[in-house]
């Protein structure tokens, strides 16, 4: 009824859709012309020091991808893990190898949903833009989930100008080609942050995120794909951004 064109299935606490219910959701989404994405559970750490937690993390991503695919979803995003005080290069290799298990399993199952590690909001979390883009270059069916508020929070207030937003988009195109901008999964929200990064999400008008300049950059680069509002007032900010975007020349 709001006229919005996308929705994210939130599996952040648990995968709350059964495989029996999924086809019904797919049918409704198709009839309503809505693109679905999915956010896998928060309880994921592909760099855990405990093998059981790594296995559980892999299973959570796989099961999210399976249900999301049955729902007809476009992509599944997730927070990959934590550095755990280790060398980032070592962490990268560990997470990459565990993601290979995910991508090879889904390939065997003929599940072609996009697997999307997300840019994260804290320095302790794996997932700066270079790490996510490198994973996307090196792994089958992997593309970034680009959370612009997380860039802003992770750097304690940087990445908040047209030039900086454009720089991110230029980097994506340089690393992934035009496809990187044509197949985007984006999160936008207001955000509270401090020296350690993200604290919590805010409504856009209550935050300092320069979202109008971000929307202008997305328009100028002719970005395509899906943009998801993660503000507390999800629909209000989604409509706000849509209306501003449509008004851009």
Model feature map: region roles:
Residues 30, 47-146:
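Active-site acidic/histidine proton-transfer and metal-coordination neighborhood
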Residues 101-197:
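Acidic/histidine-rich catalytic cores of soluble enzymes
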Residues 1-3, 32, 74, 92, ...:
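A structural signal for the main folded, soluble domain(s) of proteins
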Residues 22-26, 61, 65, 96-103, ...:
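Generic structural signal for well-ordered alpha-helices
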Residues 235-249:
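C-terminal helical cap(s) of enzyme catalytic domains, especially alpha/beta-barrels
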Residues 1-3, 16-37, 64-72, 103-110, ...:
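Acidic (Asp/Glu)-rich catalytic clusters
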Residues 10-21, 45-48, 83-86, 122-127, ...:
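Acidic-and-aromatic substrate-binding clefts and catalytic sites of carbohydrate-active enzymes
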Residues 7-9, 36-40, 76-78, 115-117, ...:
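Hydrophobic faces of well-ordered beta-strands that scaffold small-molecule active sites
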């Amino acid at each position: 009824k709001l006229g919005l064109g996308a929705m994210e299935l939130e599996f952040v606490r648990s995968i709350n859709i059964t495989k029996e219910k999924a086809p019904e959701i797919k049918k409704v989404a198709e009839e309503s012309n809505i693109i679905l994405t999915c956010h896998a559970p928060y309880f994921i750490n592909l760099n855990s020091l405990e093998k059981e937690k790594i296995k559980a993390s892999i299973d959570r991503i796989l099961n999210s991808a399976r249900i999301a695919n049955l729902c007809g979803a476009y992509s599944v995003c997730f927070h990959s893990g934590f550095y755990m005080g280790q060398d980032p290069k070592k962490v990268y290799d560990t997470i990459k190898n565990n993601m290979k298990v995910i991508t090879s399993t889904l390939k065997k199952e003929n599940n072609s949903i996009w697997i999307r590690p997300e840019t994260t909001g804290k320095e302790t979390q794996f997932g700066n833009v270079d790490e996510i883009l490198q994973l996307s270059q090196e792994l089958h069916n992997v593309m970034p989930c680009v959370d612009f508020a997380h860039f802003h929070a992770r750097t304690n207030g940087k990445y908040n100008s047209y030039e900086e937003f454009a720089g991110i988009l230029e980097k994506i195109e340089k690393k992934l080609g035009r496809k990187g901008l044509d197949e985007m999964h984006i999160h936008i929200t207001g955000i509270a942050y401090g020296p350690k990064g993200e604290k919590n999400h805010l409504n856009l008008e209550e935050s300092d995120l320069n979202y109008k300049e971000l929307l202008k950059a997305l328009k100028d680069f002719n970005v395509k794909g899906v943009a998801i509002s993660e503000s507390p007032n999800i629909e209000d900010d989604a409509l706000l951004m849509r209306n501003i975007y449509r008004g851009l020349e």
